[in-house]
Amino acid sequence: MRRSIGSVLATALVLVGAPLLLLGVSGCGDSDEPAAASQSEFTARGRYGVATRDFVFVDTTRPTQPNGSYAGAPERTLPARVWYPTSPAADRQGTPVRNGGAAASTESVASDGPFPIIGYAHGFLSSRIEAADLKVHLASHGYVVIAPDFPLSNGTAPGGPTFGDLGNQPADLAFVMDAVAAMDGENADLARAVDSSRRGIMGLSLGGGTTLIGAFHPVLHLDRIQAAVASAPVACFFGAAFYAHALPTVLLAGSADELVPLATGPGRAFEFAPPPVILVNLLGGNHLGFTGLDLPGDENSDEIGCKAVAAAIANGDAGIDQLTRKLTENASPDVVDPSSCNRGVCEQRFLQTMGGARQLELAGVAALAHFEAVLRGRADAARFLTEAFAANNPEVEVSVKP
């Protein structure tokens, strides 16, 4: 029997096992409905090799705002890494680095594309190589994944990392996805490999907030995406009016997340977001587990992230005023409602019982199944995610708004 996630969600849930019409899955009892796909299909590495290429894209149409000691710039500079499928024998990736510089592979893209493209949004203080194993996993299953360093929220941002630029980040994702699809010369094979009619976005923490803006915001949403996955999204700042558009979305949560607790992050987003939306709660999982981080000696490895975020906020302007202006520009002031942001950073402690490797594996299963369901039209993948995933894994709860 499923365990309840909490009264904050009770009125919104349609529990796993109920008849549903989500992502092409018909009601229980239909004779022509497919069986759920096997979890091993989403856990195992895919049939493609994986390689990476590094780029620096410059959007000359949008500025980078001033930030502390940084005067700003008339353009937005976006170092980015692309993970892409190759032939199985050409499994070679560029050396991961925090900011630019790695010599990328020149391996050709697999010839049986084009492939869906996924834009990945990193979290606060992080970078484009965040959760690299997840990106490799998706690329091995036939996805082109691109992740930029956002100008003012990455760990080495000029003037110090800030939340204030969050509202500009969805357009950064759209820009780099378009840039890859338009490449020529020695990178023309990447452009040919991208199916721009099949696009998804995903992200973690502040990048999860970026994903929510791109999916739901009445003005800043991205028109050309079909699916989204938000891991531990920062959502306490978004009011009910924020969720103005419907998009098939998976929200990933860890019940032991100290940085973005379930109730004020993914749970709040699930409460307000229009269907179809799925909430996956990983019992005992935390925040940094979505990057695969394991610190076995710690009661909760989020402690290291808590200290880093608290120090960054204490040492600079968090940028809330700038973020509010961006979110409410040409939109109702009700898109912003910080009433749930009433706790200090990591004020509530939780016991982490799920290891980071297991958490990242389960997150990858959920993300891949969702993208397969939406971007490749696989009803068996949708049925797995909404019915079999929780049944197969006692540490997983799944709730659905069809």
Functional labels for PLM-detected ranges:
Residues 222-290:
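The feature captures the conserved acid-bearing segment of alpha/beta-hydrolase catalytic domains
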Residues 24-27:
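C-terminal motif of bacterial Sec signal peptides marking the signal peptidase cleavage site
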Residues 163-196:
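Alpha/beta-hydrolase active-site loop
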Residues 29-31:
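Bacterial signal peptide processing site
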Residues 107-115, 120-157, 258-262:
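Short substrate-entry loop that stabilizes the transition state in hydrolases
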Residues 203-207, 211:
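Gly/Ala-rich beta-loop-alpha elbow adjacent to hydrolase catalytic centers
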